[in-house]
Amino acid sequence: MAAQQKIRIKLKSYDHSLVDKWALRIIDVVKQTDAIIFGPIPLPTKAHVYTVNRSPHVDKKSREQFSFSSHKRLIEIINPTSRTIDMLMKLELPSGVDVEIKS
């Protein structure tokens, strides 16, 4: 049995609707090239919480908390063709989405 080539694409953003929209767009592009695709697989959402003092010198009990969540999706492409890779390279993602590609 021959080894299968695999591409993993991780999308990360602070806006879950943006991640979902672009994950579906990547899937549509890959489906046009007849490659096998798994996903989008939702990865755990990470919540970031920052606590700061409200005043600069006194009132240690008076604090304020800021939080934001980062949402991630994983897309796996099995046996990509050169056409698949070309179409993925031509795709322009918005600035709010971070893309990590591993093969």
Swiss-Prot record:
GO terms for cellular component: ribonucleoprotein complex; ribosome. Disulfide bonds: none annotated. GO terms for molecular function: structural constituent of ribosome; tRNA binding. Gene3D superfamilies: Ribosomal protein S10 domain. GO terms for biological process: translation. Transmembrane segments: none annotated. The keyword Cell inner membrane does not apply. Pfam families: Ribosomal_S10. The keyword Zinc does not apply. Keywords: Ribonucleoprotein, Ribosomal protein. Signal peptide: none annotated. SMART domains: Ribosomal_S10 (SM01403). InterPro entries: Ribosomal_uS10, Ribosomal_uS10_CS, Ribosomal_uS10_dom, Ribosomal_uS10_dom_sf. Part of the 30S ribosomal subunit. Involved in the binding of tRNA to the ribosomes. Belongs to the universal ribosomal protein uS10 family. This is Small ribosomal subunit protein uS10. The lineage of its organism: Bacteria, Pseudomonadati, Chlorobiota, Chlorobiia, Chlorobiales. The gene is rpsJ.
